[in-house]
Design a protein with these regions (language model features):
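Short, charge-patterned binding micro-sites
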Residues: 2-31, 60-63
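A generic structural signal for short beta-strands and their flanking turns/coil linkers
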Residues: 5-7, 22-26, 49, 67-69, ...
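Short amphipathic beta-strand starts and helix->beta connectors
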Residues: 6-15, 50-59, 110-123
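Extended, solvent-exposed, turn-rich assembly/linker loops in the middle of proteins
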Residues: 26, 37-47, 55, 72
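Short amphipathic alpha-helices in soluble, non-transmembrane regions
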Residues: 38-47, 84-94, 147-149
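Internal, conserved structured core segments that host functional sites
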Residues: 51-94
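Core RNA-modification/binding signature centered on pseudouridine synthases
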Residues: 95-178
Length: 178
């Protein structure tokens, strides 16, 4: 420790800029034994408005267990375009491959994200086009929802607005990360 103690805190799957989440995991070390309810109360007292503590628990899985993330994505389109966009979305997932340019620290690579992306559901309503997807996530392979949207918008026009909500973080067996 010395004169400058270091904080141990990690976010196993940090959110990308512009993505919301129902629940986020954070792993941190305490320097003394504390009741979980006290930890939750003390954290909640110093969080910014709009943030809350859902649960405090001992870690069950290592961060390396994360394999998937599920998202709810809403794309705003005018009413007259929604059915065509729904058709285009289903067509994208009917393809055997979905090639995108993925940017990494080593440069850009052409990547087929189709084996690592599943369309769970989709629909249109008065708010636009909705899709629920499962994408590979974690330390070995991470497919961002923005990459999927780039692939979708290659052959369509950009949405008037986009809302991305991460709804779950899952392990390889698709069990909730804990």
């Amino acid at each position: 420790q010395g004169f400058n103690p270091h904080l141990y805190m990690t976010f196993p799957l940090p959110l990308a800029l512009g993505v919301e989440s129902l629940r986020e995991a954070v792993d941190f070390r305490l320097v003394q034994q504390m009741d979980f309810q006290r930890v939750a109360d003390e954290m909640a007292a110093v969080l910014p408005p709009g943030f809350g503590v859902v649960e405090v628990a001992a870690p069950v899985m290592p961060a390396s267990a994360i394999a998937w993330a599920e998202y709810e994505i809403r794309l705003a389109y005018p009413e007259q375009e929604r059915e065509a966009m729904l058709f285009a979305l289903k067509g994208l997932f009917d393809k055997p491959s979905i090639d995108v340019v993925k940017k990494t620290k080593k440069g850009e690579t052409l990547t087929d994200i189709r084996p690592h992306a599943a369309l769970l559901d989709c629909k249109t309503d008065e708010n636009g086009l909705w899709m629920w997807v499962r994408l590979a996530a974690g330390s070995t392979l991470n497919i961002s929802p923005q990459l999927l949207l780039e692939a979708f918008q290659k052959n369509t026009r950009p949405a008037d607005s986009v809302k991305i909500l991460r709804t779950a973080i899952l392990d390889a067996e698709r069990k909730p990360f804990a």
